[in-house]
């Protein structure tokens, strides 16, 4: 009898060592809540494996406790991996730039990540978990939800977790010439200028479409003449590359009705900057004469006929380079020279008034003063043909007034810049000089954050950041454009600007009695919205944005 009692008391299996998830239940519940709200790029299988690691029975209690300590850094890394925050590669690659931020700006950035509503919701969830766990085995529900999420993943692509990610009906896009259809590399159909988007949005199909896009873009370029006609009229080209300005920013600042926008002759309403960082944006603009390339290829040598300003130099245009800053942060000036092909000397910045200080404490010069200096310098040029690249950043996040650490109000800075540019346009009109001005923002400033990124964060080139306002204005025309701007609302990018420049190279637009504006603006190259940084790619596919991080699976961009 004694022997029988002893045998039944001895453990026959490991069942008694299934201790549940304990406090890790709350960890997973928080994730489920964030996933439901659309704030996570959740990885079901990795989380299920992590839960299995936590649940695996371990007889020795000391080893069980040790497992929890080991799980802490793993859980933190997995949580970070499940968010949309920049990965280690991105942080390491930009570590030197972050080190250049002022302390006040770093504090400002950190405070933007604090969402008091979310903190309140998590607190309520904590209290609910503590209360319900007295009677309910929460671990059972957590494991069931994890299994369910993994079953959903097995049923289709990873983004099937969101209803918005379901395949839509076939959408056909049209290019600048709707009647033109060609085949891209690999036999993929291309309608007009853009690869057709007919396949369901699976990761494999989106990767294939992106490859077809780059293959098709590699074949496109603007055709510049070998020389100008004898009766060509000289004029000046001024390209203003403004940092941190998108349609979303203008709307958030309440400046959509600013008179500046009504003073352009041509306005691109659907222009993709293709990136959300300054260096790559400038390179893409300076290489506008060829189709869009991948982010990696931006830092590889390009064909000589890709460089817009070099093409103009070959036709007798004098190059000018000027900046509203010193160009040192992030090696911007170096990138412009090495990868953008702008080797001309930087226009003199001596005694320019400093109106702002950048997030790194560097000077930001007054745009009116810089533009007036350009007027003076180019007026003294012996060559009446010139092409100027002007990069300026008065709207950059973190800019502040001298003596004040707080970031200056975006709306006030944007209002000032728009007013100054409008006044400059008036002065140009009065001068009688023949000038083509092209205003092309680098990217938006992310004035409004979204579910993936807080305000000011641009690691992922979202549509609200890369959809930028581009305007073209001609001065000194015999027959200037009348009425509202001509709106180009087809998907466009830098190649359209290059082609537009080619169409007016002979300068006759300035002397003609009647300008055929429809002919000038019709059939410009269209470019599918593809935006890329070193660690993220965002595409528009079947009228929905999709994002891929660090070469992983495609998921719908949270709306």
Report residues per predicted region.
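Transmembrane and membrane-interface helices of multi-pass
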Residues: 1-181
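Histidine-centered active-site microenvironments of extracellular/periplasmic hydrolases
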Residues: 11-14, 434, 440-480
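Proline/Glycine/Serine-rich low-complexity intrinsically disordered segments
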Residues: 236, 261-264, 390, 422, ...
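A structural motif corresponding to the C-terminal end of an alpha-helix
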Residues: 315-316, 424-434
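Active-site His/acidic residue clusters
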Residues: 330, 374-419, 423, 446-457
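Phosphate/adenylate-binding glycine loop and adjacent helical scaffold
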Residues: 505, 509-559
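Active-site-proximal alpha/beta segments of enzymes that process anionic O-linked groups
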Residues: 156-401, 467, 494, 499-519
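A short beta-strand-to-alpha-helix junction
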Residues: 299-306, 407-417, 460-466, 478-501, ...
